[in-house]
Regions:
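Gly/Ser-rich "nucleophile elbow"/oxyanion-hole loop immediately N-terminal to the catalytic nucleophile
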Residues: 26, 72-109
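A domain-start/cap signature at the N-terminus of enzymes
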Residues: 1-30, 64, 107, 112, ...
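Active-site machinery of serine-nucleophile hydrolases
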Residues: 30, 34-83
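Short alpha-helix in the alpha/beta-hydrolase fold that links the catalytic acid
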Residues: 46-47, 160-170
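Short beta-strand immediately N-terminal to the catalytic nucleophile in serine-hydrolase-like folds
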Residues: 104-106, 131, 151
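Histidine-bearing beta->alpha loop at or near hydrolase active sites
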Residues: 153, 183-190
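A conserved short beta-strand
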Residues: 123-134
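Short beta-strand/loop motif that positions the catalytic acidic residue
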Residues: 149-152, 156
């Protein structure tokens, strides 16, 4: 089943979002998918171009509830973290999702958004899978209690694989559990589709359960 709704945030930003779920969705995890820059706007059909929504459009079903919001055209996910959190909170309540089974993934701009959202709300997620993304390396300490499985094509010239390499290495240096899965011979869009279609990325996300909900301070919080 699929529901498409519109959310108006507390600061009056409008965002469309889809929720795909099986008939019996009791006790299932929530997977949040953040799309890339080319799928922004108000035409929700654009969201189905890549990643998990593309698989949903093709008829694939998952043993999970899938939330896939659409970023407004004038923003990027890194600017929409608070608004995204409002939608996640709504879906968790609406579908009675257990808070230890919420996971996050995204590709390209959504890969960056995955890193950023997880660093803003690490206590919210049981695990993350950024695909062809990157972020702010000095903030990776926020992820030390969160499993990270990153994916990136080694022929990606849109977002170089070095972006994922730096984030994974920084997370590990802070004591986190992070790994980079290199998609050999693949570029940007084809690498993204390969990660979701031909690897066990989704199955691994479904297997994650959160056990540590403690607050992790920013580096600057520890200094003052």
């Amino acid at each position: 089943m699929l529901n498409v709704k519109t959310h108006i945030s507390n600061d009056e930003k409008t965002m469309n979002f889809g929720v795909a779920f099986p008939n019996d969705y009791n006790d299932l995890p929530l997977i949040i998918y953040l799309h890339g820059a080319g799928e922004r706007g108000k035409n929700f059909e654009h969201v189905y171009r890549h990643g998990i929504p593309k698989l949903i459009k093709e008829g694939k079903e998952f043993n999970a509830i899938i939330l896939f919001p659409q970023c407004p055209a004038q923003f990027i996910w890194n600017n929409m973290v608070k608004e995204l959190k409002e939608i996640i909170d709504f879906v968790i309540k609406e579908y009675k999702i257990k808070k230890d089974r919420v996971v996050l993934t995204g590709s390209s701009m959504g890969g960056y958004g995955t890193w950023e959202t997880a660093m803003c709300y690490p206590e919210l997620f049981a695990g993350i899978a950024p695909v062809a993304g990157g972020g702010v390396v000095w903030r990776c300490g926020k992820l030390k209690n969160l499993p990270v499985i990153a994916y990136h094509g080694d022929k990606d010239f849109t977002v170089p694989i070095s972006q994922s390499e730096c984030m994974v290495e920084s997370t590990k240096n802070f004591g986190g559990n992070a790994e980079l899965n290199v998609i050999s011979g693949y570029g940007h869009n084809d690498g993204i589709d390969y990660a979701y279609r031909n690897t066990n990325l989704i199955e691994r996300l479904i297997s994650f359960r959160k056990t540590n909900f403690e607050h992790v301070p920013e580096v600057c919080e520890e200094l003052f």
